Amino acid sequence: MDTALIKDFFDCCREAKKILELLPPLPQGLTPRHIQIIDTISQLEEKNGLVKISDISTALHVTRPSITRLVSELAAAGYAQKAGSATDGRVTYVALTNKGKSCCDFYVKRYHNWVSSQLTGIKPDDLICAAATIRSFYAALKNSEPPKL
């Protein structure tokens, strides 16, 4: 493959990262990663009812310790609540508080609706293709060893 295309793709990835930086200002102490966790909890609650730390970990392909830390931060800030399973001490359930649901409504649902209204010139198939390309590119490289100096 032409290395100029690879360079252009990397440049576009850097621009794509800037898109995430266009989020409205987040409440103090929250990061875009926290918003992603809140969104995932919301989706899993709608789909399954009860949400476990392991469910979030599986959905996001992130280690359980990382999710546990992020959920603990959300709980400490009042966006989520944690509860241990009555039958299995290894299981922790997570639910959004009203504060977490409001955060999800604004930073995910309302913001995504606003973004959608701004993209009138972009076809859905173009977004599908862009997302598929990024996922394929990542999958091709994630387990490869880059060259060493």
Descriptions of predicted regions:
Residues 1-32, 39:
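N-terminal leader segment of winged-helix/HTH proteins
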Residues 7, 12, 109-149:
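Terminal interaction helix/tail motif
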Residues 36-42, 102:
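Pre-recognition alpha-helix immediately N-terminal to the DNA-recognition helix
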Residues 53:
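Helix-turn-helix DNA-binding elements, focusing on the entry/boundary residues of the two helices
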Residues 57:
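The alpha-helix within a helix-turn-helix
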Residues 65:
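Key DNA-contact positions within bacterial/archaeal DNA-binding proteins
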Residues 72-129:
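Charged, amphipathic alpha-helical coiled-coil/dimerization segments
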